[in-house]
Amino acid sequence: MMVKVTKLVASRPIVVFCVLAFLVVVFECIWISNWRTTTENLVKEVASFTEDLRTSLVSEIENIGKFTYAKTNLSTIGLARVIDSYITNNDTGFTEIQTQIAPLLFVAYSTILQVSQVSYISRDGLMFSYIAESNTSVAVFANSSSNSSRGDYTWYTQTVDQLTGRLNGNSTKSQSLDVTHTDWFQAAQSNNYTTAFVGTSLGGEDNETLIQSVVSLYSKKGLVSLGFPVKTLTEVLNSLNLHGEELYMWTKDGTVLVREGSLNDSFFISNGSICFGRESNSLWSQCIPENCSSSGYEVEIKRLRYQAFCSVIEVSGVPLRYTLMFPNKGGATRIKHQAEKAKYQLIVVMIFLGFGWPVWFVWFMMQATRREMHMRATLINQMEATQQAERKSMNKSQAFANASHDIRGALAGMKGLIDICRDGVKPGSDVDTTLNQVNVCAKDLVALLNSVLDMSKIESGKMQLVEEDFNLSKLLEDVIDFYHPVAMKKGVDVVLDPHDGSVFKFSNVRGDSGRLKQILNNLVSNAVKFTVDGHIAVRAWAQRPGSNSSVVLASYPKGVSKFVKSMFCKNKEESSTYETEISNSIRNNANTMEFVFEVDDTGKGIPMEMRKSVFENYVQVRETAQGHQGTGLGLGIVQSLVRLMGGEIRITDKAMGEKGTCFQFNVLLTTLESPPVSDMKVRQEIEAGGDYVSTPNLGLTINTSLGGSMNIRNLSPRFNNCLSSSPKQEGSRVVLLLKNEERRRVTEKYIKNLGIKVTVVEKWEHLSYALERLFGFSPQSSMGRAECSLSCPSSRELPFIGMDGIDSRSQLPKRRSISFSAVVLLVIDAKTGPFFELCDIVKQFRRGLPHGISCKVVWLNESSTRVSERGDISCSRPLHGSRLMEVLKMLPEFGGTVLKEPPTELQRESLLRHSFVAERSPKHKVQEEGPSSMFNKKLGKRIMASTDSESETRVKSVRTGRKPIGNPEDEQETSKPSDDEFLRGKRVLVVDDNFISRKVATGKLKKMGVSEVEQCDSGKEALRLVTEGLTQREEQGSVDKLPFDYIFMDCQMPEMDGYEATREIRKVEKSYGVRTPIIAVSGHDPGSEEARETIQAGMDAFLDKSLNQLANVIREIESKRH
């Protein structure tokens, strides 16, 4: 288009000039005409004056409604809560009302400003009320129930003492009303809880109109009502200076409160609308609709025109409607001369621009013509080259997709054939070992193919996130548990560092768990690969996305939407402003949290000059990659996935002298539970870097001296004040003897943050001395590092943040005299020293324990067969996350109980079965957390595949008896039954053009008990078999039996592919009224576009060529069918 314009300017500049000049003149004429019209409208003074007056009056009326009786509802709610706390019996009689509730009512009657009535009404009609009359106060009460069948429900009126509220003189009967059947009473007793209305007082002689604020008691035993005179509101409104305007106000039910104007004699309410004009000998009337608030409503009354504006104000919860009437009296113009002068100035400027701008434009376009024509030829050549490159790229992508599909199919067939061969050889033989090695190589090929495919998807922009609900803390623990055995073979410990504990509070999130696990797996795998000694720490915490955060917003518009947005941004500053607005909107979302992860190792490290290039594809650090094979795609894919999830990854600097590398990345995830307003303070505490302790997902329960229990998630400062009133004893202590220094430091810090005193022993030789001195000195004594953790201020003054976001350190009860016995929990790593000598030290310590203090021992990395003391627990898996919290639940502060004698064998088996649940006796029962607790009672072995495309998790429960918890050889699978004989008696059709794939699928189905497997190599053959089977079924009359119970359909086949075959089969089945489950089998990923097309084609499920999830898919289909 631009080329055509420049060509036209170059060939005929005079014509272009004339056209442009004409257009400018026309534009000027239109502009001047609009200017004149606008100026004439502006000189009309009445509209502006009326609008200003209306705005000011409306503002004054709304302020009056806002600040008159502003706190009546709060007063009513406060009085209701106080009365509710005094009512203890279910059936409260009039005597209790007169002696307990009446004094509270009189206190409210005496202290609340402008109150005219304070009443309490029980749900059976018993009532007591204080009412203000002319110069005195009276009490109106009903001492009998309105539900009585005797019909003697009566109200009495009696004067009261102005100072004490006591009844004086004799009572007199007054007009009674069954308030329990009124609309406002029923509304307050229902789910509404509060209500308000305008009505007369409950009793008394004046019958003054009041604004009644009614609040139901939380126990639903009655309600409380406060009445405030309407006269105060009307006096304030009548005192307004309306500047000759008229004001009318009424309630929803038609009660007129204010009528201030000359139309009082003809004013009335009809069906909620205000009407005028009704006279004694006239039937006409003029009504104003309720929706006249937007632009005003023109009405003519008594030959005068008015403009009416309607609105609603809320006074103490009661909506009041009002109408402002403005008479139209005309106006005058005062700025006409200024407008005419500005008009002439504008004409002069436009004439100058009308001739100057076209000349400049023609000259500029002629200069640009030469450059444009030269660029045209270059652009044509570039477009042809680009189109050719795009065709090549499309062909390459298609060829790569087909090749990857074939490679996946071949690898799946290879793995299937390996499984078939392994079934026929002796386990542990040389052939079995060789086959196992071949299987490992096949898995490596699949992992390599997945990496290449992921990079291809990322480069083409086809990578998409699959959001789902998952538990973040469990995902972290599963990743670490998977790599811990591999790292321990090298002498490297993998530690989970919860940092401030915030990741447990916000553990239930929504996002792509598969991609997040892929990121963590890659980083931890690299850390294990390049670390030969020391440790690997995986650290995580949550924080609000702040202005200094490096988060790259994943919701920022991409593609066409981004281009459209950029069309309206004139420069980079506007584009940056738009980007900032989106960033602020996401950061202000209360459900969006930024999760920061760190993978810190003590390996060889990455040089400073290689830190940026290490995230590029096919780049490896030579200094650290020697002896390790790889493609160099891992970190490049990780960076792309992190950015896709709305974050950024970087390598952080470590302290001087520390070796290794620390990768840090952050992602945006959505929390599933909307945090309350008070949680904002908690998040501010997280952002400030303070230790966070209130983690509701931990399921920690603290036993109180009152015999009940208190959950940390419900802790509030008010409850802490209640606790602090009773004296407490010295609490439990934890003694840590761990081999790895980093695990020791992380565990110590986390237990301290929970408020438990910790003694750390670095060497096993110091254990005896530390245990002897444990109770030999006061907490103020000095005994080196072991006692410092019990006495230093940083331990005693740990911040304890409740769910209301308030620091409760000053309100926490001091641990000096607790009602339960203290416990010393010993956590000992058996690899720190000789096991039997450690056992002797523990036995000697137990013999010397003071009365009332018990000892519990958790042995790490040790088989329970060597644990001699009954009641001791052994664990062969790393102590962190849920297992650490289950250990802490053995303490009485967190729900554990103290046994007076060693547990029986049956009790010990229960201990091992429930995995670290505290000992139980018939007299003491531990309160357990509900389903929301993050700690699965079935701790066990979790195995995750290292590939990015597939993962499996097997949960095994621990056998009862004297077995260590978490030991793989002592676990049995209980989460689901065996897959053997799962499809006994079923008839299956396998459709695949590859013979090996059919053979592998047939073998697996036979192992699952399938009685008959029929094979075919094309979709057309499958359609024929299904059609013939349905026809024979109809002829034989066996309508209850399908030709095939399941059909496994390959997606890509010659002649007729799986998609078309499925559509045709569904058409045939529709005529018979049946549906056979069709499971798609393809070499593509489950989350790919091809997988979504299978569902659209009518297939019931999707499987990759490996068929690893075959049993799960069939179970899911069967569950939907039944």
UniProtKB/Swiss-Prot annotation:
Pfam families: HATPase_c (PF02518), HisKA (PF00512), Response_reg (PF00072). Residues 34-345 are extracellular. It is a multi-pass membrane protein. Residues 987-1120 form the Response regulatory domain. The keyword Glycoprotein does not apply. Residues 918-981 are annotated as: Disordered. It catalyses: ATP + protein L-histidine = ADP + protein N-phospho-L-histidine. Its EC number is 2.7.13.3. Signal peptide: none annotated. The modification 4-aspartylphosphate is found at residue 1050. It is found in: Cell membrane. It is an enzyme of class 2 (transferase). Homodimer. Interacts with AHP2 and AHP3. This is Histidine kinase CKI1. The gene is CKI1.
